[in-house]
Design a protein with these regions (language model features):
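Post-transcriptional modification and biogenesis factors for structured RNAs
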Residues: 1-232
Length: 232
């Protein structure tokens, strides 16, 4: 399965190297870098000791949207305070969600933000699920390399599961659901309700395959009734 880790605008080459080393240790091999050239600094390879192949094969993208273009389901790490009205999953919950998603999507990605400011709200809107690491400190802080290690350790089980090939159309269920819900909110004249829209979009990320199929049926019935009502 395609499952890259994506680092958005990393500033410190040492953090890229540490991320690559953590990935290698836990069996992850695909690294994508967005809007940064820090990976070319010699410090990247020095810190990535033993994980030079990940550095050699990393892919660079101009924007997060470009890096996610071939991804069916994406998860972004963020602090709870940045989450607005969104659903917020722990690393343990993310593991269970991705193990289920692995049965019916063809590609997944884990996104990490900038060292100093994380991901913008616009970037958070591009992913399917948000997650963060619960910490006890009053002013909790993990550097990028540490955060990558936590998630690679937690999600290592994904590398041990042989996922079946996704059936045609299944991998696109979530994207289709998002589009249908957005269109329905417009038709109901409630698209300006940001809190509800955010809640709906983020809750889609935790749906299992059967739930997604049932929601498609429900939306179909709602859309049909709206058409019949307008026609009457």
């Amino acid at each position: 399965m395609l499952f890259p880790l994506i680092l958005v605008s990393p500033a410190r080459p040492e953090n890229i190297g540490a991320a690559a080393r953590a990935m290698k240790t836990m069996g992850f091999t695909q690294l994508r870098i967005v809007a940064s050239e820090a990976q070319h600094d010699p410090a990247t390879r020095r810190v990535a000791h033993g994980a030079g192949d990940i550095i050699d094969n990393l892919q660079h993208y101009a924007t997060l949207a470009d890096a996610l273009a071939d991804i069916d389901f994406s998860v972004a790490t963020t602090a709870r305070s940045r989450a607005k009205y969104r659903y917020y999953a722990t690393p343990q919950q993310v593991e269970n969600i991705l193990l289920e998603k692995q049965q019916w999507v063809s590609s997944m990605a884990l996104v990490f933000g900038r060292e100093d400011s994380g991901l913008t709200n616009e970037e958070l809107d591009q992913v399917d699920l948000l997650t963060g690491i619960p910490m006890a400190a009053d002013y909790p802080s993990l550097n990028l390399g540490q955060a990558v290690m936590v998630y690679c350790y937690q999600l290592a089980a994904l590398n041990k599961v042989v996922a079946p090939a996704a059936a045609p159309g299944e991998a696109g269920q979530l994207a289709a659901l998002r589009q249908r819900i957005e269109q329905l909110l417009v038709r109901l004249n409630v698209s300006d309700d940001e809190k509800m829209a955010d809640w709906l979009q983020q809750r889609l990320g935790v749906l299992e395959q059967r739930d997604s199929a049932m929601l498609h049926r429900l939306l179909h019935d709602i859309e049909k009734n709206l058409i019949d009502k307008n026609a009457g």
